[in-house]
């Protein structure tokens, strides 16, 4: 296609979630309440962790960093989704679409590395308890969280630069409720194999290597736990990792269903539904998984709410 005959797309139209007529206002209210709950829930975790001296430890520093990530993450997707429920035509500019894609990809990549960092923290706590405070220092925690964000945002910058260089000159109807890589590239009218290859390589690096680090950490944790002679001690040691392991399982399972499904079971409707669950529901579930099983956090929450200390 000759360059002079190409009219580049400057605006995308988001199809949004499939809804029955008349249900969009109910869905708007449902997702709005969910969004507000995520904000309040994660802000509360951050405030409680930073205001309670008993929680000034590496595990809770990682937890507050994860809550900050969840707030940013859900705020990248949900406002545009809510707008889509109220408007007949859900438009987003090309720059706005690339910006949304950049932050979505960056935050997913950051969470991969942050979960691996949290797995390392649990590994040291279980396998080297006497050296824990020497190995996992506040400085190291800051470096691990900083590295998670820097690596996630840098890799995503490269991915989005390649994707934004692709020419979009045909249909501008994006069959999704937010700007994701696969539905965007389906609208390309020039060869996008280079952008697709770069995306695959960088996604492999940022997803697989942190996952391998997490698996390796839990392999050593499992071996250490199995060496504990008493069943009570064994359960107590492993229960400290149960919340993080649950979040890791939910996170990677959702990613696999979203991006690594066989073509035979792939459909835009199911993909959008899984994406909606992943982008809105998991930011609610993750803090609950971490906090509801944690006695120290529940005690700090009761103290913050003026309900007094639990009896010992």
From Swiss-Prot:
Alphabetized Gene3D superfamilies for the sequence: Rhodopsin 7-helix transmembrane proteins
Encoding gene (name): OR6B2
Main localization, broad class: membrane
Physiological role: Odorant receptor.
Keyword annotations: Cell membrane, Disulfide bond, G-protein coupled receptor, Glycoprotein, Membrane, Olfaction, Receptor, Sensory transduction, Transducer, Transmembrane, Transmembrane helix
List of glycosylated residues: 5
One Gene Ontology cellular component annotation held by this UniProt entry: cytosol
Organism: Homo sapiens
Protein name (record): Olfactory receptor 6B2
UniProt GO molecular function: G protein-coupled receptor activity; odorant binding; olfactory receptor activity
Superkingdom to which the source organism belongs: Eukaryota
Keyword Nucleotide-binding: no
Membrane-traversing stretches: 26-46, 55-75, 100-120, 140-160, 197-217, 238-258, 272-292
Presence of the UniProt keyword Transmembrane helix in the record: yes
Extracellular compartment residues: 1-25, 76-99, 161-196, 259-271
Membrane topology: Multi-pass membrane protein
Entry's localization field: Cell membrane
Annotated family: Belongs to the G-protein coupled receptor 1 family.
């Amino acid at each position: 296609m000759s360059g002079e005959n190409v009219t580049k797309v400057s605006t995308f139209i988001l199809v949004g979630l499939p809804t029955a007529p008349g249900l969009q206002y109910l869905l708007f209210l449902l997702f709005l309440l969910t969004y507000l709950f995520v904000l309040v829930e994660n802000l509360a975790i951050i405030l409680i962790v930073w205001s309670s001296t008993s929680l000034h430890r590496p595990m809770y520093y990682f937890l507050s960093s994860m809550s900050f990530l969840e707030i940013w993450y859900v705020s990248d997707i949900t406002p545009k989704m809510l707008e889509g429920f109220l408007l007949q035509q859900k438009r987003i500019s090309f720059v706005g679409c690339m910006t949304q894609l950049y932050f979505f990809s960056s935050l997913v990549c950051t969470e991969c590395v942050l979960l691996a960092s949290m797995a390392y923290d649990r590994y040291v706590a279980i396998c080297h308890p006497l050296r824990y405070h020497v190995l996992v220092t506040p400085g190291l925690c800051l470096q691990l969280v900083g590295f998670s964000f820097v690596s996630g945002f840098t890799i995503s910058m490269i991915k989005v630069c390649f994707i934004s260089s692709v020419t979009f000159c045909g249909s501008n109807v994006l069959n999704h409720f937010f700007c994701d890589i696969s539905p965007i590239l389906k609208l390309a009218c020039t060869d996008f194999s280079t952008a697709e290859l770069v995306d695959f390589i960088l996604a492999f690096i940022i997803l697989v290597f942190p996952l391998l680090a997490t698996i390796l950490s839990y392999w050593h944790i499992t071996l250490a736990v199995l060496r504990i002679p008493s069943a009570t001690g064994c359960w107590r040691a492993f229960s400290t990792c149960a919340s993080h392991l649950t979040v890791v399982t939910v996170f990677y399972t959702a990613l696999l269903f979203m991006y690594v499904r066989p073509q035979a079971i792939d459909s835009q409707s199911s993909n959008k539904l899984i994406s909606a669950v992943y982008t809105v529901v998991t930011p609610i579930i993750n803090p609950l998984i971490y906090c509801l099983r944690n006695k120290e956090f529940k005690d700090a929450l009761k103290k913050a709410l003026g309900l007094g200390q639990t009896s010992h």
